[in-house]
């Protein structure tokens, strides 16, 4: 609760935590299997960060669409890599991504490169999640065979 209150007071902490979670999940993707203990520790940190990011009080106050787009990427990538339960987290990430694309479609303005890149990251993970799930359906539910 103390961390959530700090995040509520300082919005840059929320953004930093999103990028921290992104660095964790990106690192986990590139790690070799023999580093299992380190991987599990990174996964613990990642899950703790995502839990903090999705706490209702912390998330309600975020106005930065770039951070929302990056958070959708972080969650969707975690679902694809099985670091998070897809059934529990994917819908949250897809809702965030839909908000991002709704703002792109309805607001007649120019968006900065950081925002567009974060939205593209989120969208690419959404596509990859669909491909993995479709592949699993065709293989009797086995995703990694």
Predicted feature descriptions by range:
Residues 1, 8, 55-59, 105:
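Acidic/polar residues at beta-strand termini and the immediately following turn/coil
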Residues 1-25:
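Loop-centered beta-sheet repeat module
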Residues 3, 27, 46, 53-56, ...:
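Alpha-helical solenoid scaffolds that mediate protein-protein interactions
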Residues 8, 32-36, 58, 83-84, ...:
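Short, flexible helix-adjacent loops and helix caps
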Residues 11-15, 36-40, 62, 111:
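Short, solvent-exposed segments of well-ordered alpha helices
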Residues 19-60:
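Oxyanion-binding "anion nests"
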Residues 60-145:
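CBM-like carbohydrate-recognition segments
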